[in-house]
Amino acid sequence: MAADLAVNPGQCTLAYWHRPRWQDNGRTSGNSSYFVQALHNAGAEVILNGHEHLYERFAPQTPAGVAGADGIRQFTVGTGGKNRHGLSGTAPRNAQARSSSAFGVLALTLHPTSYDWRFVSEAGRTFTDSGSHPCH
């Protein structure tokens, strides 16, 4: 992966896989630490995960979980419709938005120098999350 990132140094890089690095309960997935480090070294912008049946958006952060402008933003979007997991009582460090109240999808738009996101809830639910962010 690091070699692929090195020969494709474009802005607004997005990566995705199943289990999130940072999770609602404050745990981290050690299995993804190599990927997150390689992506951070390459200046990637976004990680998109599922697995947890909830929605979370984290501030850009380093592989160590320290918020910073040069970090990677993680979205956990496991809200496809099977069931919903409850949220832990305390938001994990750097969590900016989270919900387990609605099924829905995340619309991501990658621009040449920025990206936009918008969580679209199922009919009848009011949770929403949207924004834009510049690329590194």
Language-model regions, residue ranges each:
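His/acidic metal-ligating clusters that form di-metal
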Residues: 1-73, 135
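Binuclear metal-dependent phosphoesterase catalytic core
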Residues: 64-136
